Amino acid sequence: MVEPLLSGIVLGMITVSAFGLFVAAFLQYRRGNQFEI
């Protein structure tokens, strides 16, 4: 009974953390480009 809930939480955490890393990298990349110009 608990395993589906646990796997769902783990998948959600992985998705959110991956999305957060992508957004942070994108913002840092844009900020670097603005500094260069």
Swiss-Prot record:
GO cellular component, one term: cytochrome b6f complex
Organism from which the protein derives: Thalassiosira pseudonana (Marine diatom)
Membrane topology per record: Single-pass membrane protein
Subcellular location: Plastid, Chloroplast thylakoid membrane
One of the GO biological process terms: photosynthesis
Cross-referenced InterPro entries: Cyt_6/f_cplx_su5, Cyt_6/f_cplx_su5_sf
Lineage: Eukaryota, Sar, Stramenopiles, Ochrophyta, Bacillariophyta
Signal peptide as annotated in the record: none
Gene responsible for this protein: petG
Similarity-based family: Belongs to the PetG family.
Stated role: Component of the cytochrome b6-f complex, which mediates electron transfer between photosystem II (PSII) and photosystem I (PSI), cyclic electron flow around PSI, and state transitions. PetG is required for either the stability or assembly of the cytochrome b6-f complex.
Transmembrane segments: 5-25
Keywords: Chloroplast, Electron transport, Membrane, Photosynthesis, Plastid, Thylakoid, Transmembrane, Transmembrane helix, Transport
SUPFAM superfamilies registered for this protein in UniProt: PetG subunit of the cytochrome b6f complex
Descriptive protein name: Cytochrome b6-f complex subunit 5
Source domain of life: Eukaryota
Subunit field text: The 4 large subunits of the cytochrome b6-f complex are cytochrome b6, subunit IV (17 kDa polypeptide, PetD), cytochrome f and the Rieske protein, while the 4 small subunits are PetG, PetL, PetM and PetN. The complex functions as a dimer.
GO molecular function, one term: electron transporter, transferring electrons within cytochrome b6/f complex of photosystem II activity
